Each structure stands twice: as structure tokens, then as C-alpha cells.
């Protein structure tokens, strides 16, 4: 069969945010293992408020990635750039993007022209009409299957991680995103 080329994005993290990534792993591990198999962790030695980790914890009904996206979208004044392989937003995320575009924010969403999940492609296309009517630019990436999950708002807020802008990633799955508030990074 034919092989699909995949385009992805990654970050290499150092410093206090590494602690937060480790903590999110240990919370998941410890929830599913007995006392003698628990992972220990200790608080970080320092803090860096510019770089944080948003890690969903489904058993606790904690979904900070979605809240981080909503906060950034609602604060946007100039530009929102979203890159995701599967774009199936819930109503609140969709409305926040539509509202941003209607108030003059340049909203651009890049998805693969053809992903590795045709049903997700069909579901994604169902949002395009409303988005185009509101003035949102939809970019279909053709060079490969884009698997990157990144966003940048106003050249200052950025996120890179495992969460798609879809209902599963933002409201059900274990996911982790690095959130960076820094113009040089954005």
C-alpha cells in the first residue's frame, strides 16, 4: 500500500515545565497502579510563568487545555493561527472563533486536505460553511498529512502538544500541551 507522509511539530522543554509534564504522567500512572508501584514526584525548584503545561485529567474532570484555548481566543485582538489534524470543535470553542473573526481578528485554521481519518475529515468539513461566512480562513495542507497540534494568538501566546481542536482531545482524553506566553517563541 501507499505510505502517508506525516508533518508534525515538537518542542524540547527544559526547566520547570518538565516537572509539570512528569507530574501529569505520574498522576495517570498512580491512578492505575497499586501503592507499591506508585511514581513519586516533588515540587519544582523554580517557576517560569512564561511556560506552563496544561494536562487533561479525565478521572478528575479537569480539562485545562480547552480552557487555555478559550481564554486565548477570547483575548485575541489581531490574529489566531490554529494547526490541527482533526478540527471538530465543541459549540463554545466554535462560537469563540466565530466571534473573534466577526470582531475583526484574522482567524486562520489549517487542517490536512486528507487526514488518516476520513470520518474526521467529513466531520471537520461540516464546520467550514459557518467559519467561511464569519470570515475565518481555512487552509488545507496538501504536502503531507499534517499531524501538528499548534496554535498562536497575537504573536505572544502559543501552544504545542498532543491535543487536537476536537471534542475528544479537549473534553475527554488524556492530553498534554505546553503553553508559552512569549513573543520570541510565538
Where do the protein language model's features map onto the residues?
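Charged, low-complexity intrinsically disordered terminal segments
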Residues: 2-3, 7-186
